[in-house]
Amino acid sequence: MARLLTNSQAEELHKSIIAYLSANGLPETTAILRKELGVTEHDFNATAVKKYETLLEKNGPLLFAYRESRDSKAWLPQRPRYSLHSHRDTINCIAFHPKYSSIASGSDDCTIKIWDWELGELEVTLKGHTRAVRDLDYGSPPGAVGVLLASCSSDLTIKLWDPADGYKNIRTLQGHDHIVSAVRFIPNGSLLASASRDMDVRLWDVTNGYCVKTIQGHTGWVRDVCASLDGRFILSTGDDMTVRLWDISAKPENKLTMVGHENFNECCAIAPPTSYQYLAPLARLAKVSRAGSTAEFMATGSRDKTIKLWDARGTCLMTLTGHDNWVRAIVFHPGGRYLLSVSDDKTLRCWDLSQEGKCVKTIRDTHGGFITCLRWAPAILKDTPTDAARALVRQIPDVAEIMKNATFEESFSDVQIRCVVATGSVDKKLQIFAG
């Protein structure tokens, strides 16, 4: 069982079992287990017992169902485990901590709230922005002590928060001339990308707070931005109805401009390497070339109610239809086979890329209003150091080699993927879907 759980999950399970045994009148068994697991009386007082005594009964079926269904590559969200409510206005954005069971949500109420998604509890409320919080992202940039949380706002600023220091606001970045609509940490470096209604994409050095590059080309509000896994490329989209791929490895270069949507674009995503085996046939490729980039395939969502899949040549491979209103957010399943989307039609849809983008699941009635945001908990390693695994991935030049290596693929999916999805809405609720 330990192989399937993070340290945090294992600790919660141990405490839940101890509390359950204690509540059911088994003091000797409780004492033996507490000693075996190293849980002291100080660590597990009466308050802790009350907190955990019903947790096993609530989450036990989910835990064992997860053990029985170990193919995390095929997991899709079902009904929400928790519906969390504390914001006083629309939730615009969410972000998962890369290691722990924390999730951040940002709202029109100008606050950021940090929750424990395993327990369904609010941990802290962050105040600092003076207008709506538009986007959030966690990252671990070199030079920073641990993980940082970035937030951006309609107040024209970007703020950096330190989770290790009680989420202290350690830096405020200023430079955009209008609403800052999106932020994303760029992997393998100290850069943060931001998108704004001022039509610019900016790159910031989070170690000193300086804007190091301003990327121009869009002719309207830039709604969203994301980065490739190696940090070489960023993808941006917005109200000019274009999708732009930029090579930021040297002088910013508009490598590719894609046009096809018939209304403002709301969101974009770069496909992970695990998706290549499903997307390559759509591009009539036998496999991805060794000379290929880490931005071989992309997806965009629009107010025209569609999702489009693109390749690195700028070709629209497919248009996914089914939503009845604006597509607000999209995310690729870490296993690569599925693409998930949410919309103002109040649905979460799952599209199977192995079946030419067929919609195989529609989840309705979990929110009472437009669904504004969607995130999948980032993958983690439980048995292998994260840096070592990343180094291994970087040493394999062809994604096809990963797919051929069954042992690596199995460990990559079973050990890394966290089956947790979250959505936020104008109904002020944060929904947690967990397997």
From Swiss-Prot:
Report keywords, A-Z.
Cell cycle, Cell division, Coiled coil, Cytoplasm, Cytoskeleton, Microtubule, Mitosis, Repeat, Transport, WD repeat
- Show where the LisH domain sits: 9-41
The ranges of the WD repeats are 86-125, 128-171, 175-214, 217-256, 280-320, 322-361, 366-396, 397-434
Question: Does Transferase appear among the keywords?
Answer: no
* Gene Ontology biological-process entries: cell division; establishment of mitotic spindle orientation; microtubule sliding
Q: Which domain of life is it from?
A: Eukaryota
Q: Cellular component GO terms, alphabetically?
A: cytoplasm; microtubule; microtubule associated complex; spindle pole; transferase complex
The principal location of this protein is cytoplasm
Q: Name one Pfam family in it.
A: LisH_PAC1
**Briefly, what is this protein's role?**
Positively regulates the activity of the minus-end directed microtubule motor protein dynein. May enhance dynein-mediated microtubule sliding by targeting dynein to the microtubule plus end. Required for nuclear migration during vegetative growth as well as development. Required for retrograde early endosome (EE) transport from the hyphal tip. Required for localization of dynein to the mitotic spindle poles. Recruits additional proteins to the dynein complex at SPBs.
Listed HAMAP family:
lis1 (MF_03141)
What binding partners and quaternary form does the record give?
Self-associates. Interacts with nudE and dynein.
In Swiss-Prot or TrEMBL terms, this protein is called Nuclear distribution protein nudF 2
